[in-house]
């Protein structure tokens, strides 16, 4: 198992500076990570730094709350794609899910999928804020909207990925979608347990430590 190819090398903290983004991209190339995952303001920088590599540029949309309106999420997505993003990690409207306004949740995702124009869309459902029924309905909405992945967490919602959540999400989407585990993955054992549970992508700021077999405290 080549762990590096499962990893979206992530830097989403609000105080991230250009030098840190440049380091993120250099590390991703050195260690052959699948992508870097950044906020939209850094997409152009990453696209330029990674243009001659196999590392993709992933960015977050509607992050971290998911509470912005659908039109804004679609615009952010279009701008990110135009600037060089190849994958989009969007946050659902969590309140709408809990209100059972499922048409809104689905249409919100669908608007981002359409704006992404064929590029991979991962749907962050923020599992730490959801009960089992919420999680199931969120995954079904993402599936119906035509997204490519469901993703556990933003890393900003008070909790991260768990094996049980990954198993549940995979059981709902089956072979029609993939699952990204993110938040709190700090060592190789955790990473492998998420993959064994059904995850095909891992979002973490600890990718180097993970592939080297260590563990780390703090971070995403």
Curated annotation (Swiss-Prot):
It is found in: Cytoplasm. Its main location: cytoplasm. One of its GO terms (molecular function) is deoxyribose-phosphate aldolase activity. GO terms for cellular component: cytoplasm. GO terms for biological process: 2-deoxyribose 1-phosphate catabolic process; carbohydrate catabolic process; deoxyribonucleotide catabolic process. The keyword Cytoplasm applies. Belongs to the DeoC/FbaB aldolase family. DeoC type 1 subfamily. HAMAP family: DeoC_type1 (MF_00114). This is Deoxyribose-phosphate aldolase. It comes from Bdellovibrio bacteriovorus (strain ATCC 15356 / DSM 50701 / NCIMB 9529 / HD100). The lineage of its organism: Bacteria, Pseudomonadati, Bdellovibrionota, Bdellovibrionia, Bdellovibrionales. The gene is deoC.
């Amino acid at each position: 198992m080549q762990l590096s190819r499962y990893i979206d090398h992530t830097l989403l903290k609000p105080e991230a500076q250009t030098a840190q983004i440049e380091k993120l991209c250099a590390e991703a190339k050195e260690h052959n990570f699948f992508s870097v995952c950044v906020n939209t303001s850094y997409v152009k920088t990453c696209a330029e730094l990674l243009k001659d590599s196999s590392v993709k540029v992933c960015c977050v949309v509607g992050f971290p709350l998911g509470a912005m309106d659908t039109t804004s999420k679609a615009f952010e997505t279009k701008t990110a794609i135009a600037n060089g993003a190849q994958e989009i990690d969007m946050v659902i409207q969590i309140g709408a899910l809990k209100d059972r306004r499922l048409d809104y949740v689905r249409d919100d995702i669908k608007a981002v999928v359409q704006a992404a124009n064929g590029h991979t869309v991962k749907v962050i459902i923020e599992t730490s804020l959801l009960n089992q029924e919420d999680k199931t309905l969120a995954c079904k909405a993402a599936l119906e909207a035509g997204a490519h992945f469901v993703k556990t967490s933003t890393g900003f919602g008070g909790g991260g990925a768990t094996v049980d959540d990954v198993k549940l999400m995979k059981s709902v989407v089956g072979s029609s979608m993939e699952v990204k585990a993110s938040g709190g993955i700090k060592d190789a054992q955790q990473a492998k347990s998420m993959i064994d549970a059904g995850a095909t992508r891992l979002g973490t700021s600890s990718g180097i430590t993970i592939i080297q077999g260590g563990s780390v405290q703090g971070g995403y």
